[in-house]
């Protein structure tokens, strides 16, 4: 099995905290859709650990950004149809669309989503459309003053209305994103955000501590003393409140920043943490073949459009993996290679398995560590974990039926240690 990630690098405006690759140049959208579909089609013969990409069962498709909901319905349909035509997408695949509150009004008809009866006119319009069955809504906070501060385009009433519209359209798998530790945000404001979020009948919640990334507007404001970072004590209190409320509402804390009702874990994100191969399409998108090779697409939107709008021979996509700077395509100079490849060492693969495993409630699969990296590496991991086990920062889950010298199946973080997880991960890595 494998997953597909589609990067839509367009935003109507840039948020104050965002450092993801995106642009506000809407005039490039049409050309981008053409180039994107070319990349999707050209890469169908890539070799993944599970087999040739076009023959592997695709279990998740994820539209991220940027803001995928800035595209027209017809443009999203073209991209989805291209994916389904070139890859074996499972009938029950999870297909997620990231969306901003308010975009539903102008973007999608209800028939875009599964489970909604449509009129004959709508049905004819939607022939061939591959349905989205999960929406991830970027709300961030329900406080209007904080929304203005971080330069979000919507207000709280728009966010609430969008959730209601999605539910009315038959979408029964809705995730929302929240941010805590915003400048000036109090614990009472955060408690209000959580109260509203859990009252909406959503199935999934992702909540992240605000990060001041270099080059962002918020980072500049902090350096100019216009805003101040939340202190550690407040951040810990907010995270503790998040975990408590989620538990009360019956949400499973299945990853450090992710909470879901039973049966609604994000299958796409879970595949990343489990080391499943995935194909990433679009500028700055990353891919992993399931063996040891990572691919990173050139982040330049202009060069991406130039390259994928001009090549015809699918084999060229492979031959140009390490194309030198200054190569030309369609008689135009391309300053950088369209993508780069990285072969991960055993140590890097081990470190990634540790980091991804510890982020989840299940923890590190010790049988997998022994199978992939050997008994010696497993013993080294358990030795490095020993001080944290004694201090109850790590927990060993045991099962006598499993043939491991330690009789343990998984090594996981104690919930009380999540706030120092980075330090613990560092101790366990090679």
Residue ranges with predicted function:
Residues 1-3, 22-46, 56-325, 329-375:
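C-terminal scaffold of the Radical SAM
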Residues 5-7:
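Short active-site neighborhood of thiol/selenol oxidoreductases, capturing the structured segment around
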Residues 9-20:
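Local cysteine-cluster metal-coordination motifs and their immediate loop/turn environment
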Residues 375-388:
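Short amphipathic alpha-helical interaction segments
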Residues 390-404:
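A short, conserved structural fragment
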Residues 404-405, 409-414:
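Minor-groove-contacting beta-hairpin "wing" of winged helix-turn-helix DNA-binding domains
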Residues 415-430:
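Short, amphipathic alpha-helical interaction segments positioned at domain boundaries
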């Amino acid at each position: 099995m494998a997953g597909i990630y589609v990067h839509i690098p367009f935003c109507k405006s840039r948020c104050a905290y965002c450092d993801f690759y995106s642009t506000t140049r809407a005039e490039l959208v049409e050309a981008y859709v053409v180039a994107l579909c070319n990349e999707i089609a050209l890469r169908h013969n890539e070799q993944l650990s599970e087999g040739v990409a076009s023959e592997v069962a695709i279990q998740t498709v994820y539209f991220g950004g940027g803001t995928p909901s800035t595209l027209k319905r017809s443009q999203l349909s073209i991209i989805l149809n291209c994916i389904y035509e070139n890859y074996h997408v499972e009938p029950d695949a999870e297909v997620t669309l990231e969306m901003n509150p308010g975009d539903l009004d102008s973007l999608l008809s209800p028939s875009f989503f599964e489970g909604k009866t449509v009129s004959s006119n709508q049905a004819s319009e939607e022939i061939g459309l591959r349905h989205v069955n999960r929406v991830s809504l970027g709300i961030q906070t329900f406080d209007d003053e904080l929304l203005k501060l971080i330069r979000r385009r919507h207000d709280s009433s728009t966010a609430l209305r969008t959730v209601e519209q999605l539910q009315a359209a038959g979408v029964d798998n809705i995730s929302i994103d929240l941010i805590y530790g915003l400048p000036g945000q109090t614990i009472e404001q955060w408690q209000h955000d959580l109260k509203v979020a859990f009252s909406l009948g959503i199935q999934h919640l992702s909540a992240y501590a605000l990060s001041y990334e270099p080059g962002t507007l918020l980072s500049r404001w902090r350096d100019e003393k216009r805003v101040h970072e939340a202190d550690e004590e407040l951040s810990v209190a907010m995270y503790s409140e998040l975990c408590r409320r989620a538990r009360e509402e019956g949400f499973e804390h299945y990853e450090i920043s992710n909470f879901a009702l039973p049966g609604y874990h994000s299958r796409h994100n879970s595949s990343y943490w489990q080391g499943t191969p995935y194909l990433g399409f679009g500028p700055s998108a990353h891919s992993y073949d399931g063996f040891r090779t990572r691919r990173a697409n050139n982040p330049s939107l202009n060069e991406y459009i130039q390259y994928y709008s001009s090549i015809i021979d699918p084999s060229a996509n492979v031959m140009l993996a390490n194309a030198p700077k200054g190569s030309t395509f369609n008689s135009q100079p391309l300053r950088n290679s369209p993508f780069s490849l990285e072969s991960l060492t055993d140590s890097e693969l081990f470190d990634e398995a540790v980091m991804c495993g510890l982020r989840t409630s299940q923890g590190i699969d010790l049988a997998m560590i022994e199978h992939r990296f050997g008994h010696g590496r497993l013993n080294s991991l358990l030795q490095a974990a020993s001080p944290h086990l004694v201090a109850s920062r790590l927990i060993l889950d045991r099962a006598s039926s499993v043939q491991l010298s330690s009789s343990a199946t998984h090594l996981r973080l104690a919930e009380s240690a999540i706030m120092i997880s980075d330090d613990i991960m560092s101790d366990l890595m090679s």
